[in-house]
Amino acid sequence: MSMRSPISAQLALDGVGTMVNCTIKSEEKKEPCHEAPQGSATAAEPQPGDPARASQDSADPQAPAQGNFRGSWDCSSPEGNGSPEPKRPGVSEAASGSQEKLDFNRNLKEVVPAIEKLLSSDWKERFLGRNSMEAKDVKGTQESLAEKELQLLVMIHQLSTLRDQLLTAHSEQKNMAAMLFEKQQQQMELARQQQEQIAKQQQQLIQQQHKINLLQQQIQQVNMPYVMIPAFPPSHQPLPVTPDSQLALPIQPIPCKPVEYPLQLLHSPPAPVVKRPGAMATHHPLQEPSQPLNLTAKPKAPELPNTSSSPSLKMSSCVPRPPSHGGPTRDLQSSPPSLPLGFLGEGDAVTKAIQDARQLLHSHSGALDGSPNTPFRKDLISLDSSPAKERLEDGCVHPLEEAMLSCDMDGSRHFPESRNSSHIKRPMNAFMVWAKDERRKILQAFPDMHNSSISKILGSRWKSMTNQEKQPYYEEQARLSRQHLEKYPDYKYKPRPKRTCIVEGKRLRVGEYKALMRTRRQDARQSYVIPPQAGQVQMSSSDVLYPRAAGMPLAQPLVEHYVPRSLDPNMPVIVNTCSLREEGEGTDDRHSVADGEMYRYSEDEDSEGEEKSDGELVVLTD
């Protein structure tokens, strides 16, 4: 007992682990006691790589410590390694066993806090140092390097995937650009093809329009009236009435024999010229005076007959001749074209005008001669008198120029005061600027197309154009207007003078002239009454306008009986000139010149207005 207290004091003072009853072996065993709790403490700290060793270190020091506390009483270190000291003799141990245990427990309670203090300071330092060393070791371990390498691999993989994505996006953009370019090329190609198709369609339309115009011209040529009443007598220059001289073929001169009337009235377009040398030799003097009046044939052509030698042409062309020449003028009163006019079903306007003119002529001639046979005999005699024909031709040809200069009914013929060499043209408007090139293109494609057809096509195209398409041409119009204003600052637009006509020494406008002719026709209708005569053939108005006997063969005695002797003045009858000449040779050829002059003067006075009125009607309707 007295020996244990100094042991505890000694332990408390120096802490060296020396005991009186223990050998040096106990001191050597103390060092593992100091190491044991350190190992246990360190083992208590969880190590990631060695869990089995930590559990063994933490379990081993507890078992020998308990064995030391229970089985040995002389060991100074309560936490021994498990090997007990050699026991004392059993006499002392048996005597003081229970009391020693109590003292040991009490001393243990006093010693343990001091030991814990000593162990805690040393143990904490070593534990902290070891932890720092272990932390330093952890930074450079293979696992951390593997983790870092894994992270780097992941980053490399991500970068490679990002690069692939960028490359694919770039290639897609290139493909999209190529596709867009191809689409644009396709659209441009489609647009070009559409424009070509539109151009082809326009050309086809122009061709169809040209064909339609040609067909219309052919139809008009077939249905046109055979009696043409121009406003002016034709000049010596070839007139552009129609390019085909075949239009004169259907209207052939009536043969010498009346038996051939129906053959010539039932006309056909390719009707040949009558091949009768005797008849042609007989008719040749009759055709020469009327050659300047032929509108469809060339002048001085002996083959072509007198196609348009209607009474209206004779009267209108011979108006200004002086009354000094002798010989009557109604030489073609019964001209062949008078009957085909009604036979073809021409409108009532021209036919009625011709009938009115004939009524006026008969009204004036009836007052002078007294009977309808006398002027007809004058016609028959005048056909045979060649000096009279020469005088008539001279009187008709030379006053033609005077008539052309005196009468300006056609507005496009003579404008000497406004269309001189110093005439300033107006600046072109937008339509004219556009139509200039378009007209040239159409003429290059279709050189035979008529100007009126081209104008219709251009007008329809201009109307179908939008304002945006017309804008550059309006700008060109403004530029031309400014240029024209700079070039001609004092320019003023002077419109063409209105059409006038000199009638009885007075210059009348078109409206006044028509009104005058209308009143004259009405007065002539009211003042003229035909008394019925016995033995004459009475015909209705429908027979006069549309003679039904046109295609009927008539007996030769009947024709010879009715035509020369009892001819109705209002009845348009085709007269056979050969038969008339045969009958007229035996008649009296004595007529006073005064009567002829008076007859011609009265006829010319009324026929001038009437025939010009009829000619004006035809020109305006066309």
Swiss-Prot record:
Keywords: Cytoplasm, Differentiation, DNA-binding, Nucleus, Phosphoprotein, Repressor, Transcription, Transcription regulation. It is found in: Nucleus; Cytoplasm. GO terms for cellular component: chromatin; cytoplasm; nucleoplasm; nucleus. Residues 305-315 have a biased composition (Polar residues). Disulfide bonds: none annotated. GO terms for biological process: anatomical structure morphogenesis; cell fate commitment; gamma-delta T cell differentiation; negative regulation of canonical Wnt signaling pathway; negative regulation of DNA-templated transcription; negative regulation of transcription by RNA polymerase II; positive regulation of brown fat cell differentiation; positive regulation of gamma-delta T cell differentiation. It holds the Pfam family HMG_box. The keyword Mitochondrion does not apply. Residues 581-602 have a biased composition (Basic and acidic residues). It is linked to Autoantibodies against SOX13 are present in sera from patients with type 1 diabetes. Homodimer; homodimerization reduces DNA binding efficiency. Interacts with TCF7/TCF1 long isoform (via N-terminus); inhibits WNT-mediated transcriptional activity. Interacts with HHEX (via N-terminus); abolishes the SOX13-mediated inhibition of WNT-mediated transcriptional activity via competitive inhibition of the SOX13-TCF7 complex. This is Transcription factor SOX-13. It comes from Homo sapiens (Human). The lineage of its organism: Eukaryota, Metazoa, Chordata, Craniata, Vertebrata.
